[in-house]
């Protein structure tokens, strides 16, 4: 029995990749009992996606297999296993728990706080405004409109104050978004996931495994939703290239000039 574990402080997005690995081992019959050790964020994962309980296990004297922090599509996991995992373990509860939220035309996730500390600026940073504006400009072109005044926009973020003080005013000024059409959600990791899934047309994702999983689920549940992602992951891996499964997504270049070491 392969029992995967991590000791690197995985959060929810990383933990889902861990569960995907156990599912992939079972799916391809590498080990039909492969599982994930019940540590870290497993309680949140089980609360959000109850069926994942089947993939967790206690140690029970089994050999523990460490799991890498970064997972690359096509190398560490296949698209087939990913779609199967989403459908079998995540999709039902996601649909149920997101149904209470009104769908927004555009959903935007803004991740800031853990990118603004020390070396993380260099390893992960890029110009957020530049990236978001590129996505919104492409939406305008697709919709053939001069502004986004008739669109609803949901924002989730780990830094609501910054969004209120800096981002929202620019969105109103540059894109004509009406204040009543901008829904800034309270900070709540669990609910933010389901709020982002309640997306009618466009999802703009930061460089975040958490939000990539929303995109994965939208791809199998509502493939007409267009997902935008940055063409960047981290300078620590693959020359910074995006490593998620980006099938049918729009990958946008990012501006890292102010974050590159001299």
PLM region spans:
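A conserved amphipathic alpha-helix that caps or lines the catalytic cleft of carbohydrate-
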Residues: 22, 26, 136, 215-218
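Donor-binding and catalytic core of enzymes assembling or modifying cell-surface/extracellular glycoconjugates
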Residues: 8, 12, 145-238, 243
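Aromatic-acidic/polar surface patches that form glycan- and anion
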Residues: 7-15, 121-128, 207
